Amino acid sequence: MKNFSIAKSRRLRSTPYTSRIEKQGVTAYTIYNHMLLPAAFGSIEDSYKHLKEHVQIWDVAAERQVEISGKDSAELVQLMTCRDLSKSKIGRCYYCPIIDENGNLVNDPVVLKLDENKWWISIADSDVIFFAKGLASGHKFDVKIVEPVVDIMAIQGPKSFALMEKVFGKKITELKFFGFDYFDFEGTKHLIARSGWSKQGGYEVYVENTQSGQKLYDHLFEVGKEFNVGPGCPNLIERIESALLSYGNDFDNNDNPFECGFDQYVSLDSDINFLGKEKLKEIKLKGPQKKLRGVKIDIKEISLTGSKNIYDENNNVIGELRSACYSPHFQKVIGIAMIKKSHWEASQGFKIQINDNTINGNVCDLPFI
């Protein structure tokens, strides 16, 4: 499938930064939570190298928030996730797989505890707000559920710390990973978390004041010149090498947390109540029959739309390739695949059909780097 233009419509939301990134040379978008998400600024490989050496500003406003508040908000948030939040603290972020009644994944958001009775669920690409509203209605919870006007910009890369210190002062460098606090920019307070969808380090600014956020975006580029700041976006190569999983690509509502390696976030032994708990107990007892694994494929390029079956030497399907890219580090194609138990051990060989050619590959551990 070739890249193609996206038709404008009321259903397709732009972001407060769209006009800026278009001037900065965005070359591709994807759709994420019904909103434009930049997918490329020229060469993905060049952007990958820049991200790992310098600092980038990302328009990730498509990472929408589901705000849940009210006296039953903590009970509802806990019902949605298999992770025990009973000891969660204000000012912290928590990676929280959201589970349905069958024990399958609905989303894998980061949950921010703003107050004892106020939470933001920073979602991946699915309509979590309707899931939350359905549970709230069915359980008659006293909560308010809205999508607030919050447009995240991310500052990512090894030089992000120096850039953010220059703008916000020494205090911001003291934020611990997955911690957040409020920082002033020209008289406006912004919630800033030490987080982001890369493993190169950085921050995410949860912009509630659009005008101030746009000024901050421009200011970061102005004062970031000495750090070789550039525009960017979540990078396919970096995320696959780092095994940063993508809902809708690497896993979806047909998969459960044990198949995706989320065991540490599944609290089956605590007395908390969450949807699908008994189903997950059954799944754990039986053991998963497939798992997400890394793969290395002996080719130099790949264009993946959807998924591709993986075969053993007897042409039996043993899994499917779900994400893939050429890795400059390994000088071959690497990917994330769902592999059957019989073939998920590292170094297990397989075959895959690409452009009418049979290519050999091997299973490996995640992350790659």
UniProtKB/Swiss-Prot annotation:
Keywords: Methyltransferase, Transferase. (6S)-5,6,7,8-tetrahydrofolate binds at S122, E204, Y206. It catalyses: S,S-dimethyl-beta-propiothetin + (6S)-5,6,7,8-tetrahydrofolate = 3-(methylsulfanyl)propanoate + (6S)-5-methyl-5,6,7,8-tetrahydrofolate + H(+). GO terms for biological process: methylation. Pfam families: GCV_T, GCV_T_C. Non-competitively inhibited by MMPA, weakly inhibited by substrate analogs dimethylsulfoniobutanoate and dimethylsulfoniopentanoate. It is used as an intracellular osmolyte. It is an enzyme of class 2 (transferase). InterPro entries: GCST_C, GCV_T_N, GcvT/YgfZ/DmdA, GcvT/YgfZ_C, TrmE/GcvT_dom1. The keyword Methyltransferase applies. Optimum pH is 7.0-8.0. Its EC number is 2.1.1.269. One of its GO terms (molecular function) is methyltransferase activity. Coiled coil: none annotated. Belongs to the GcvT family. DmdA subfamily. Major contributor to the demethylation of dimethylsulfoniopropionate (DMSP). Demethylates DMSP to methyl-mercaptopropionate (MMPA). DMSP is used as an intracellular osmolyte, predator deterrent and antioxidant. Homodimer. NCBIfam families: PRK12486.1. This is Dimethylsulfoniopropionate demethylase DmdA. It comes from Pelagibacter ubique (strain HTCC1062).
